[in-house]
A protein has these predicted regions:
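Beta-propeller fold recognition
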Residues: 22-369
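Bacterial Sec-dependent N-terminal signal peptides
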Residues: 1-25, 260-262
Length: 369
């Protein structure tokens, strides 16, 4: 009986180990040298004070499956795990003032190659590009053998990624500027399929003054939906269906107007959408919830911020949604994002950043349904 019990315990430990080991989004670097590290379930993330990066908006972080830092970037500079700029990693063509300036996609066929996608600010001519990081170089600290490879130009400040339905490859999604066109690129073990983009004409026109390019793009945790915030003149949130097999975007639903719509994030169960807006010129920071099970979205104002501006939303590994508060030493937190209405419990000063400050952005990650 004792031997049987021991075998059962060992089997349970072996089954649990892979799930526990997959922690690629446990480290966040963002804002004014701010950071967070997420621990076991039920614990509060702890602030990090070792970042060398300042970014007004976007950032991205690469970690091992165990949550060990590899590198981070604001779309212009890449810092290695020793918090030093990588060789050839200081002139990427993103921008710390682009909503989603950077996104890191691991090569599906290699544990050593990573692709850093960048988007220019305000529909600028640098467009959507990618750079290649090889972690076998520089004595394991990483280097960039190729940088700033152009995919398409111009684009909005929107950049998101989700795992393919095959469970291996990754779709990278952006939006053309002066267009209704989403553009999707597949990343496989053979690399970025740059010559074979998937085009989807759906939803609102992304055009006008450069500031209209502002606003985030985010996939739902189950990968079936994608949401966008359209800033200023457009002033709305949109939700679309996404096909993880074909890379196609379809069936737009619009909610608005919400002046200066900026950030979007889905609840862990993918049924509720959250969006931030600040009012024309800022000063009226609001957090809205939309129930995607209803026809009109049942829009509910679930929180206001004492901060003049709030920005990006990001679902954490702990199942809570974090809210960037511009120039503030604390993030807002949606404590129960699966709960409809104000039961979701928004806390404006939800977590302190250890003396560092948030800007408008939070790190961008590949969604892994």
């Amino acid at each position: 009986m004792k031997n049987l019990l021991l075998l059962l315990i060992m089997a349970a430990a072996l089954l649990a180990a892979p799930a526990q080991a997959q922690r690629p989004a446990d480290l966040w670097y963002f804002g004014q040298q701010a950071g967070l590290t997420f621990g076991p379930a039920g614990t509060t993330p702890a602030p990090l004070n070792n970042s060398k990066m300042t970014t007004f908006e976007g950032s991205a972080v690469a970690s091992t499956a165990k949550g060990e830092l590899l590198f981070y970037t604001n779309g212009t500079t890449v810092w290695n795990r020793q918090h030093r700029p990588m060789p050839n990693g200081t002139q990427l063509m993103g921008s710390g003032s682009s909503t989603q300036s950077a996104l890191v996609v691991p090569d599906p066929g290699s544990g050593n190659i990573f692709y850093v996608f960048t988007v220019a600010p305000q529909g600028g001519r640098d467009g959507l590009r990618y750079s290649i990081i090889d972690m076998t170089r520089a004595e394991g600290l990483g280097d960039l053998p190729r940088v700033n490879l152009l995919l398409i130009q111009p684009v909005a400040e929107k950049l998101a990624a989700v795992r393919h339905a095959n469970g291996r490859d990754v779709w990278v999604l952006a939006h053309r500027w002066n267009s209704k066109m989403f553009v999707t690129y597949l990343v496989t073990a053979e690399g970025v399929q740059a010559a074979k983009p998937i085009m989807s004409s759906v939803g609102s026109l992304n055009a006008g003054p450069g500031r209209n390019a502002i606003g985030a793009l985010q996939f739902s945790p189950d990968g079936t939906k994608v949401a966008a915030a359209l800033w200023r003149e457009t002033n709305k949130f949109e939700v679309y269906d996404f096909d993880r097999t074909t890379g196609k975007v379809s069936n737009a639903r619009s909610f608005g107007p919400y002046p200066e719509a900026y950030g979007v994030a889905f609840s862990p169960n993918s049924q509720l959408l959250y969006g931030t807006c600040n009012g024309e010129g800022g000063g009226n920071s609001q957090l809205w919830q939309f129930d995607l099970r209803t026809k009109d979205g049942s829009p509910t104002l679930v929180g206001k911020s004492a901060n003049r501006k709030i920005g990006s939303l990001q679902l954490g590994p702990d199942g809570r949604i974090y809210v960037a508060r511009e120039d503030n030493p604390a993030l807002g937190v949606i404590q129960k994002p699966n709960d409809a209405g104000k039961a979701c419990t928004y806390v404006d000063e939800g977590i302190k950043l250890g003396g560092r400050r948030s800007k408008l952005g939070l790190p961008n990650f590949v969604v892994l349904p």
